Amino acid sequence: MNNITISESIKYIGVDDTTLDLFESQYIVPNGVSYNSYLILDEKIAVMDTVDARKTKEWFDNLDKELKERVPDYLIVSHLEPDHSANIQLFTEKYKEAKLVLSAKAKAMLPQFFNIEGLDERCIVVKEGKELDLGNHHLKFIMAPMVHWPEVMVEYETTEKILFSADGFGKFGALSHDEDWACEARRYYFNIVGKYGAPVQTLLKKASTLDIKMICPLHGPILKDNLGYYIDKYQIWSSYQSEDEGVLVASASIHGNTKEVALKVVDLLKEKGVKVAFTDLTRDDMAEAVEDAFRYSKMILAGATYDGGVFTPMEDFLHRLQHKGYQNKTVGLIENGSWAPLANKVMKDMLTPMKNITICENTVTIKSTYKDENQEAINQLVEEICH
């Protein structure tokens, strides 16, 4: 167990997973992930969520170590996604008198995951603002539907002023790996929670009324210092503002010719002092490309024509942006095609339904390979995207 100190009465009992290759079977996690769980020791004892089934033994070992032969009274179920709920059934079988504290939606969904004997008698359903008295500690329940599942709730511990934020403020990366918070928190947010900006805004508004001294998420580090920094990031991300002025250049090239043009654009932008990120959609992490698309204020797409459409990595990228609510951006288009270039039309058609997307009037069409005659169109696109 990570040697993490929260307070004398509140213990960390979570587990690192450093061998997981794909989170949610799609997001690469080179530095692993943490499944966070907490224990409040008072006159009554509350366990805050469980962990993924991959780490059942370690979690129960951590729990038993901190309980010191005491028995939990409550299991708080903030979120039913299996990486946090997998051990609910085992918990109820081991601690037969313990109650499950959860939202009405979570109780309705629970039988879809588990067959818990005497479920009605085991559950305490809580509503907005309800408080659970543990003795010196009190948990206030705040409903957070669609952050990012419908049953989610967060908890505010009123004595030590701790927000248990469920998946909010989470990040990729095991706690044993020390790294900057923002990068992997941003990638986590836009790929996991990003579609649900409005519910996140609602939760942030509720949280703004609380005196929060610490944030304990279900993934990633416990946040104690400079909480305004993390909250400001979430305000920006959930309101679909651009975090940085700059341009993401995203290339989907079959034989390298489209990528060559995209890299020329990158060089021109850098010469103008523009902050630039480049992604090769055929090879780079797609989740990181999504992250950067939301991070920067502008984007240039360079896509090859393929089967009468656009090369599939670009199509996949744009579908992901559609699903995640991409909006409030300026986008430039570059296409390549040897006999019937159609990529710009397809990319434009995919972008048009997105909210508040401005597509540059100047576009670039390459016929197979870059020629000097293409430079003027490239220059015009770069000038437009810079203004």
Language-model region placement:
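Terminal amphipathic helices with adjacent charged low-complexity linkers/tails
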Residues: 219-244
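Short, charged N-terminal beta->alpha structural module
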Residues: 250-272
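FMN-binding flavodoxin-like domain, especially the glycine-rich phosphate-binding loop
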Residues: 175-215, 219-222, 242, 264-279, ...
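Conserved beta-strand hairpin/beta-sheet module of binuclear metal-dependent hydrolase folds
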Residues: 3-63, 154-157, 161-165, 258
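Active-site neighborhood of phospho(di)ester-bond hydrolases with catalytic His/Asp-centered motifs
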Residues: 48-50, 72-80, 100-103, 163-167, ...
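Metallo-beta-lactamase
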Residues: 4-8, 102-152, 196-202
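Active-site metal-binding motif and surrounding structural segment of the metallo-beta-lactamase
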Residues: 43, 54-101
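Short acidic active-site motifs
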Residues: 87, 285-289
